[in-house]
Amino acid sequence: MIILRRNKKIVELFPIGSSKGALNSRRKPLFYGYIRLKRTNNQIRPYKFIVKKGDKESLFPPSEAVKILKKQNVYLIDGDEEIEEMLDSLNIDFKKTRICRHCTLEGYITVVNRNSAFISNKEYICRLCAEEEIKRELKYKGLSLSAFNNFKRMLDETGDLDKVLSVFDPKFNPVKNPDLTLFDKITVGKDNTPPTEIDKINIPDELKKILKLHGKYLLPVQSLALQNGLLKGENLLIVSATASGKTLIGEIAGVPNAMKGKKFMFLTPLVALANQKYRDFKKKYSKLGLKVAIKVGMSRIKAKEELTLPDDDVKNADIVVGTYEGLDFLLRSGKAGDFGELGTVVIDEIHMLDDKERGPRLNGLIKRLKSLFKDIQIIGLSATVQNPQEIANEFLMKLVEYDRRPVPLERHLIFAKSEYEKTDIMTKLARAEYKNISKKGFHGQTIIFTNSRRKTHSIADYLTKRNIKAAAYHAGLSYSKKSKIEKDFANQKISTIVTTAALAAGVDFPASQVIFEALLMGNKWLSNNEFSQMLGRAGRPTYHDIGKVYLIPEVGRKYGEETEDMQAVSLLESDVDPIYVQYDEDDVLEQCLADICSGRVHTFEELQNAYKNFDLPLGIEEAYDVIHDAGLVKEKDSKLSSTNYGKAVSVSFMDLKAAEYIRKSINPKNQTKKKRKHVDPLEIAVKLDPFENAYMSNRLNRRLGKALNINLSARLFADSTLDILSSGETLSKLEPSLQDALINMQVEFMSCKCQDRPFCNCFQEELSRRILKQRMLHKDPVDISKKLLKKYQIHSYAGDIFSWLDSVIRTLEAIRRIANAFKNHKVANECSRLIKTIEN
């Protein structure tokens, strides 16, 4: 096989062996030759034939060139009238073909055709060269090769290298070129589940009327649950996408039970979610004569813009909505009898079993429920479980799995060259999405996830300045502010919410588009499961036709060993991880104590059997010895029971180290008569749980960063921040008003005598005392926040101050319980007084 190609005044010859398998095969020519043509006797003929091997050129008779051509299959590159005339006149058959020009520059020949090649600068090049061009561009732009497969996929889909590389053009617009940013698309898929009419379900007619307000038929996953014994008391694990109708499954089983006098409990991991469900259920089911109660363990702190959710009496309630801990508190208190007959318990977000802190508690709660209430129906709900059958088997549940999304989901990947470009891209995406109106008549709306509260505000402000109605939303905001944002988003007055990844589990906005501005949760990469949960928030069947997810990693941005673009590709290529309950030693002690307090186990043998299949870091015998020696449990006639101290510790959800600190602090026997001093419960609370969410004001942070020419952390208690704030040299670099604030900070918070000052806990503890002092003077969290900013340039959100005060009350309640356990009524009464003062 010989390739002929016109190159200006010469015709190049490339003999590359057999024509069989030549297509897309990179070959080294046997030699490189060229001929010169001229017209002789009105015919085109070779008049010079040169062969080049290595650096040596040899001149051959032109007739040799003709012999070679007549013996080989001849392929002509592109059309050339002169060459074609010569071949025809010599009776040499030929075909036309294409070769990759990039390969020839490297001394190779690759035959390509239109279907197997890729367009580059109006030419066709082979796959290998196209891929090498992509790799070179990735390296030049500072991107890791982990992104290569995505570009390779784009190359296959478009067949156009120029188009693929256009994404690196500064003028590239992702809104106008969604096909070039698309990573993949998760389709709805055909559903073969037979529709179920609500009228044909065996539930009370009054409930049917309520359900039919949203349609005559059940959704597919709801039908599957019915087929698997939902109304026959079967324990079920429901695994299905967000917005596929999981919550209603619990209601279909639980509400009829409630109407028969059996309690229906709906449990969530977060107070905000519990409050939302409480409002929904009260609105829906009060008309059926059912009493709805809430149990979340919140205090009664009175504060501007905040909601208090004092716990209702669950004894007389038909439906109880609560947090996991709200219910477990009653079980650990030994008050399981307060529930009367328990019918159905729904565990929402059951994948929280994988959470490092909440997982062991949730696992223990489910086990206690199953032991204490033999006939209850437990329904677990989750959108993300990789090993659902394993979880279902663990809790003796039937698995109902529905893997179809209610709306299709597009996942996009865009590489930003800078933080400014990233923000500009988000602006374009949010603006374009709001202009999209679905077939249901709703504007597209966006959730942007970032990794810090400060960034939620800076991004929202940037969008607002560009005429996009955006709002920052995070845990530091007051209840009324969050509530207003939620309502405005629901009413489509706001197009974009900017929130933190940490709040993802509590965000329930009906968004069509989710943008990941950052791939971190705080300072840690998102896990595969967290990522899956967050992207699942894009697209709701009631509102949208399609969901969209955009990841916008910044090229070159690195956290630890991985770059942001590497992590983006890794997350998009990942599956969810299996869910396993992870215990540490404190978890083992807490759960053993909770099982004894609740009455789940009564003997040591029962305690061992309860954990015989668990891989624990601490043996049950050793764990029992620890809680027994600490005086938390006792044994009489082989029967185990908790002491008053043990019950106090368990219902306070407190680890043994903190409990022992309280016990020793309030015990007069631990103090000599000379050193005996007044026990201050507030001081104990501050030591155990100091205020954390304090930041430098934006103004102070900017001025210091500019003066010192560094990127300074805004977190007040970060070591780098403490080092700078405590330095006398820092003062001279600030304007007078900021100097005054910094002097106030240094004098009032950083003047301790500790050897490791300023890296001791004194600053944090003293700030905590100041906040408490202001609250004891009846100051509102909003006012306290303003005072900290004005006097010290310390920024703390009012919502964070409110939440911390609530946490302080939790600690004071624990101190009171432990004091009562040891009959120290003086300390207990002081705790009651302090709680009342803080609440009011």
What is the role of each PLM region?
Residues 302-310, 458, 469-472, 477-500:
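Conserved helicase ATPase core of P-loop NTP-dependent helicases/translocases
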Residues 320, 324-328, 334-373, 378:
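SF2 helicase catalytic motif II
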Residues 247-248, 262-283, 328-329, 383-389, ...:
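Conserved Walker A/P-loop ATP-binding site and its immediately adjacent core
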Residues 367, 375-460, 554-556:
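Conserved interdomain linker/interface between the two RecA-like ATPase lobes of SF2 helicase motors
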Residues 1-223, 227, 233-236, 290, ...:
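Helicase-associated low-complexity/disordered flanking segments
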